[in-house]
């Protein structure tokens, strides 16, 4: 592997700007070599003056980069020292409180089950659990800083060695000895001391003096390129996907040759449509995960997942393929139910019952930690007013807005099994066309409209909760207004449908109101997608016209195509309304809804790429590379200690003014400036695609 590829794979993406501009230095050296005057046409003194002038500029740039690295390292080291003092203080407070309440001298002597503890003891137990997680994340941040230290030294050594090789001199090596090897970022070994002290604290105080158990908890995921998935996982993904494709072909043939023309297939389609959308969503989420990892978008940090244990794209493909096979087999069984002793209505119950059991399975199998994380997240989403709302909370609620058809089909299935299904007929899911009209697929009884509004309601109350926590009307109240338009759209659609069915004279009034609010909702959401969720149409976009100053994905064409796609699919309802209003084709609304529901899932899949890119750039602007986990707020003692650290000689230093050279594809991340950076200019660096490693 070339060093540039090694560097791209191992850097911390959120700190990308703060590394040495290795590729830029390489371009600088090669350009100087190519533009150097030839000794055949000019005298030797001219050539020497050219290279002397170039070296002066080269080493000045090296000094600026070295000052930048020293400053950033000092800032992060001071932050780590403050964080370690805070964690030690929190740990000591928890241990002291435990001694006072139980008389037990050390944590490892407690062995009572949690449900036997008093309220105060449960709080202390939870604090210790949070401390273990906090020390684990803190240890990861130390390793990242140590990796930053080592990589930058290696980069300096490599680029100065290349300088000497191209210019046939030894001044690069001399400069490295005189400047880099005595630089604070390289000579300071306090990071190693912090790592050792953290290991000792976790071993002695939190893990019963067991070093193996402590290091297992502190284990750092690989900081290099993504590790290949286990061979059996890859095999299962290929096997499941192959079987799924074959079964889909079989389904099409069975539908053509086995279904009777006098039977209505719509109850069957509505019941199985939601399962297909869920499988499509999982598969596309796997592609999202792969794309984020390849582009260096740290989705593990954004969702605050455990970097040591989370699902990769391979696992998501595996789950989607497995559920897809079950979905196909269940639907095929319905087609061939007439020659079976099992009625058709049993198969959907078995399929969805298995899916629910797979999710809530209490045993520690089948991705237990990931399933438990999802269940906790769903609970937080549905109880949004009572919790602070994080990124993962409102991200999942946004996904539910694109999966509202699943909720509506679930409501239809419950209603159909309760009121319309002929339990005494084996082909109950394929009723005769001549039977009495449907009830469950209409708005007339009111429940369907309420179910359709549930996802928008969840996001609406999340926005209100965020306004309560931040007291910021913009963007939270404005965002709540966006989701409130869904309530009006669904309400007028339901009123139009019921009044049209009953032949009321005011039907067209509700139709026009429905159209008006559809236009308002689509324009509102489209503008919010482009400007707020994706951060596009930035006035400081520079060469990235209509986009933003910083872009992560390699081609600007991706962004322009995405804008067009979002406009088309946000206004796809115009096609649906036009066809259903102007045609007498039976079930035209069902046909259009069945076509457009997967397209909405696809639109959300594309939206995910750029929404997380925007959040990732926010993390880059704050240099946030690990989760922020704390048991207690910073107290006065810790604040005093922090101030002392900042006053030390190895604390934060003032940055020197510097203006880096510019390249065609660069980022300049805006962020709140530290006091030490009040007069510093933003640093631009060349972007390379990186794989942000997260073990599974």
Curated annotation (Swiss-Prot):
The record marks 573 as: Gating residue for phosphate transport. The keyword Cell division does not apply. It holds the Pfam family EXS. Phosphate binds at residues 398, 401, 482-483, 570, 603-604. One of its GO terms (molecular function) is virus receptor activity. Residues 439-643 form the EXS domain. Residues 648-696 are annotated as: Disordered. GO terms for biological process: cellular response to phosphate starvation; intracellular phosphate ion homeostasis; phosphate ion transmembrane transport. Residues 1-228, 297-309, 384-388, 472, 535-553, 627-696 are cytoplasmic. GO terms for cellular component: Golgi apparatus; plasma membrane. It catalyses: phosphate(in) = phosphate(out). Residues 2-224 form the SPX domain. Residues 260-264, 338-343, 423-429, 504-506, 586-587 are extracellular. Residues 366-383 dip into the membrane without crossing it. InterPro entries: EXS_C, SPX_dom. Residues 158-165 are annotated as: Important for inositol polyphosphate binding. Keywords: Cell membrane, Host cell receptor for virus entry, Membrane, Phosphoprotein, Receptor, Transmembrane, Transmembrane helix. It is found in: Cell membrane. The SPX domain plays a role in the regulation of phosphate flux. Inositol hexakisphosphate (Ins6P) is bound between two SPX domains of the homodimer. The SPX domain has high affinity for inositol polyphosphates and its affinity for inorganic phosphate is two to three orders of magnitude lower. Homodimer. Inorganic ion transporter that mediates phosphate ion export across plasma membrane. Plays a major role in phosphate homeostasis, preventing intracellular phosphate accumulation and possible calcium phosphate precipitation, ultimately preserving calcium signaling. Binds inositol hexakisphosphate (Ins6P) and similar inositol polyphosphates, such as 5-diphospho-inositol pentakisphosphate (5-InsP7), which are important intracellular signaling molecules involved in regulation of phosphate flux. (Microbial infection) Receptor for xenotropic and polytropic murine leukemia (X- and P-MLV) retroviruses. Belongs to the SYG1 (TC 2.A.94) family. This is Solute carrier family 53 member 1.
